[in-house]
Amino acid sequence: MAKGEFIRTKPHVNVGTIGHVDHGKTTLTAALTYVAAAENPNVEVKDYGDIDKAPEERARGITINTAHVEYETAKRHYSHVDCPGHADYIKNMITGAAQMDGAILVVSAADGPMPQTREHILLARQVGVPYIVVFMNKVDMVDDPELLDLVEMEVRDLLNQYEFPGDEVPVIRGSALLALEEMHKNPKTKRGENEWVDKIWELLDAIDEYIPTPVRDVDKPFLMPVEDVFTITGRGTVATGRIERGKVKVGDEVEIVGLAPETRKTVVTGVEMHRKTLQEGIAGDNVGLLLRGVSREEVERGQVLAKPGSITPHTKFEASVYILKKEEGGRHTGFFTGYRPQFYFRTTDVTGVVRLPQGVEMVMPGDNVTFTVELIKPVALEEGLRFAIREGGRTVGAGVVTKILE
């Protein structure tokens, strides 16, 4: 299971690609690994096919699952998620984007911003991605430099609309495909040897400089939302996810909180990251935790692992919510008390019933409102927790828990 120990030397930052389908997110992800690998023997190259794994996706050329790759610059170690681009897979986008200290927004220069470009910027805002760097891709397909300036202006405007600092955001122009083709021909191509490869370096520099090393919540009590669970024969059950805060090491007692009627305690018997054993997992790490005496059925996606007593399951809360306009992909009509959408917390959807405050008859798309929610299953909740409101697989609102009621 583990091969060698993961040594922590450089600061670790989580990034990922977002943007419209077929604008080049996966090709760019591959190019980043190739370019970084030419200057650092520790980096493993990944090709488009490696990142775009599941067979049914390849046929349509659409990435569905969230792929994780790693690369390094002289300054930092990066974990990079390639987020699904297709609208049907927003659920993955929500979990994927939640794992980013900064996002690389890929926009095709030939098309300019498209509906999913807007949707992904909105999602990044909702799930709290703090920084965005823009890679304007496919610039080799546009002859008119004025057109490139126009696309850049549109992207900056769009970022401003969703409260990102559109005027300050770095925008790098390049071609992921031409850089990747060059790296395939000459895998040792270094900085300064090819104009397209240099554009990828320009992007890496921008990520290094513009996305700050996150201030990790290491000193808070341990919490990790469970994303996936699997069994390792002879060793037990492993829960994977990104540590939201605190730290965890072998021998620590943790609680499994949410979804189940009872909160249960267990002990962590192993910590792993990228298939290597880790002395200690800290906030921001994507890890697998081996849990003592817990069967595959007793822990599931949507629960959290947490320091005992630090967080409790709740079903009723008050929230401040923004309901998307029709133009933003939201509902076309208003809703009343008794509305039952899904509430997407951390890694899962839970159905809940909305109660509007006294004097509010109806909530319309575009409204900002405070209401109470009663969930059908308990979730590990606390004030300040963000969530998405969804129905029929699409996001119709975004909110934040303002008060726990029960």
Swiss-Prot record:
Organism of this sequence: Thermus aquaticus
Localization in the cell: Cytoplasm
G4 as annotated region, ranges: 137-140
Binding site for Mg(2+): T26
Gene: tuf
Pfam family, one: GTP_EFTU_D2
Gene Ontology CC annotations of this record: cytosol
Enzymatic class: hydrolase
Span list, region G1: 19-26
Role according to the record: GTP hydrolase that promotes the GTP-dependent binding of aminoacyl-tRNA to the A-site of ribosomes during protein biosynthesis.
Positions annotated to bind GTP: 19-26, 82-86, 137-140
Region spans: G3: 82-85
Alphabetical keyword list: Cytoplasm, Elongation factor, GTP-binding, Hydrolase, Magnesium, Metal-binding, Nucleotide-binding, Protein biosynthesis
Name of the protein: Elongation factor Tu
UniProt-annotated stretches for the region G5: 175-177
Domain tr-type G positions: 10-215
